[in-house]
Regions:
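Hydrophobic "anchor" residues on beta-strands that sit immediately upstream
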Residues: 15, 72, 227
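Conserved acidic, metal-coordinating active-site core of Asp-based
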Residues: 120-227
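Active-site phosphate-binding/coordination module
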Residues: 32-130
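Short hydrophobic/aromatic-enriched beta-strand-loop microsegments
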Residues: 70-76, 148-150, 245-250
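Mg2+-dependent phosphoryl-transfer enzymes with acidic/Ser/Thr/Gly-rich catalytic loops
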Residues: 6-11, 32, 191-301
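A short, Lys/Arg-enriched amphipathic alpha-helix followed by its capping loop at the start of a domain
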Residues: 10, 14-18, 34-47, 210, ...
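Short, structured coil segments at secondary-structure junctions
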Residues: 66-69, 76-77, 181, 241-242, ...
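Asp-based phosphoryl-transfer active-site loop
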Residues: 12-29, 239
Length: 301
């Protein structure tokens, strides 16, 4: 995998932050083949892709190899930010070195989350099955992951996905129990998630501050615009953080009804195909804007 040396590249004008499952990756096959045209276009324009997911650190390794990904990434729904060492000319605040990364940890330890899930299960009188309770075979059946990928998904550090079967009132009570214990919850494509005081938006904002700081160190200083892509409620904090929020259709062709922002862009497609189309459309728009700005600058000079 290539390393990114900030001294050899100018700062990007745009950053794209994206959810994975159901967006860049197909929710059933986990393929990104339909998104390859947009991925190639982003690479040609030197636009960093920041991967933001509920996936574990262990799951990211093979995925980043497949994508030839060299930029920062955010794991377990904003629980930790991983920044390759050569990304910035400084060490991010509150980071520690871990292998070839600066790591900023924001999440609550997994063991504590498991204990709280058991407490809530007892309080509501209903079994709650977390990832830690599922066998590898059950994870494979629920998610469609291959065995090796399911094993990697089990290596959780900060976020406990769990399954709930019951009426809305039960779900409301479970969520209330979580909040009264000083923790948070969110909903992804398949699971609810028990987390600490972290989310995708908070992690993204910390990373964006680093990019903006680096941009101000350039001569002349560079401003950065941000694009964020998601498909479900756990992506809402991310979409609230960026300049251009994008919502991809769910597998059934609908949009998550809990996400409704005034400047929201709705992709006219689902999964990586919808992701591909909306990214290409945005790139065309930014190219046209850049051409207009260049024309104005020429006229002024």
């Amino acid at each position: 995998m290539r390393t990114y040396d900030i001294s050899n590249e100018t700062m990007p004008r745009y950053l794209l932050l994206t959810d994975l499952d159901g967006c860049l990756l197909d929710s059933e096959t986990y393929s990104f083949d339909d998104a390859r045209p947009a991925l190639n276009a982003l690479r040609a324009e030197h636009i960093p892709i920041i991967l933001v997911s509920g996936k574990t650190r262990a799951e990211f390794d093979p995925l980043r190899e497949r994508l030839d990904h060299r930029y920062p990434f955010i794991v377990e729904n904003g629980a930790a930010v991983y920044v390759p060492l050569d990304t910035f000319s400084f060490s991010p605040e509150r980071s520690r070195r871990r292998s070839s990364y600066h790591v900023i940890e924001l999440g609550t330890p997994y063991a504590l989350l498991r204990d709280v899930l058991r407490q809530i299960e007892e309080a509501v009188g209903t079994p709650l099955r977390g990832f830690g309770d599922l066998s590898i075979e059950e994870i494979m059946a629920t998610t469609g992951l291959l065995r090796e990928d399911a094993l990697r998904a089990k290596l959780r550090e900060f976020d406990e996905p769990f399954l709930v079967n019951g009426p809305p009132k039960l779900i409301e009570e479970i969520c209330r129990q979580i909040v009264t214990r000083g923790l948070n919850w969110t909903r992804g494509g398949r699971f609810f998630h028990l987390t600490g005081n972290n989310d995708k938006g908070r992690a993204a904002e910390i990373l964006l501050r680093c990019y903006r700081r680096q941009g101000q160190l350039q001569d002349p200083p560079e401003e950065i615009e941000t694009i964020g892509i998601g498909d479900s409620l756990n992506d809402l904090p991310l979409l609230l953080t960026v300049d251009h929020p994008v919502l991809v259709q769910r597998p059934d062709g609908s949009y998550d009804p809990d996400i409704n922002l005034p400047n929201l862009i709705r992709a006219s497609g689902r999964g990586p195909a919808g992701w591909n189309q909306v990214v290409l459309d945005l790139l065309r728009h930014t190219t046209q804007e850049a051409a207009r700005e260049q024309t104005v600058n020429i006229r002024v000079t």
